[in-house]
Amino acid sequence: MTDSHYLDRAREKLIVALDFWEVEDARKLVRKLGDEVSFYKVGLGLQLVGGNEFAKELIVEGKRVFLDYKYYDIEETVQRAVAQAAELKITFLTVHGVASIMKAAVAGRGNSDMKILGVTVLTSMDAEDIKEMGFDGKVEDLVIARAKKALEVGVDGVVASALEAAELRKQTSNKLMIVSPGIRPSGGARHDQKRVATPFEAIRAGADYLVLGRPIYAADDPKAAAQAIIQEMADALRPD
C-alpha cells in the first residue's frame, strides 16, 4: 500500500472537536483546516448558540458531523430528540451509556443512517471519580459493562478511552465501533484529561475514530498540527 492510502484512511478516522462557545470561532477553525479535516464534533458549547444550524452548514459543505450532546433524560424525550437529530443527517450522536437511554435512542434513530454511540466513562474521570459516583472497582470494568449493555440494546458503538480499546475489542467480539477522546500527541499537555493515549497508541489499541480538540485548535498552526496527527495515525495503520 502507498503512503497516500494510509494517510487517507487516517484522515477518515480523525474527528476534530469544535469546543468553542461561539459559532464564528468554530467556523474560522474549519476554514483554516480546509480539506485536511472532514469530520467535526459539535458539542454542548455550541448547542445554545446555533449548534444545530451550524451542523447543517457543515453537512452542506460536505463535512461529517458528530453531535456530542450526550442525551440523558426520560425515554420518550430521548427518543424524540434523537429522531430530530436524525433529520439533520448527523453521522454520529452520543447518549449516556444507560440501557434504557440507549434503547430509546435506537428507537428514535429509526431507519436513518445515523450511528448511536453510548458514552461509557468520560476520559476526564478516573477510579476516584467513579468511586464518588458509587461505583467500586476499576474504570475498565465499568466501561466493559456499559459496552456490553450497548451491544445488547443495539447501539452502533461506544465512546471510550483508548486505554480500554483493546479489552473492549475482546469483550464485545469486535462488534462495536470505538470512538476515543482523550488523545494527546506525545509530550502534549493533558489539560483536563486523566486517561489519555497518543494517536499512535490509540489506533494500535483498536480505536476506530480519534477525537482531538485542543491539540489542534490551540496550536499556533492548526492545520500543521492536524497534519502531524494524521501522519502519526497513518504510521499506526501501516503494518510493521
Curated annotation (Swiss-Prot):
- Cross-referenced CDD domains: OMP_decarboxylase_like
Keywords of this entry: Decarboxylase, Lyase, Pyrimidine biosynthesis
Q: Does the keyword Disulfide bond apply?
A: no
The record's EC number reads 4.1.1.23
Record's function text: Catalyzes the decarboxylation of orotidine 5'-monophosphate (OMP) to uridine 5'-monophosphate (UMP).
Q: Which PANTHER family match?
A: OROTIDINE 5'-PHOSPHATE DECARBOXYLASE
**This protein's name:** Orotidine 5'-phosphate decarboxylase
Q: Which organism is it from?
A: Nitrobacter hamburgensis (strain DSM 10229 / NCIMB 13809 / X14)
Q: Which gene encodes it?
A: pyrF
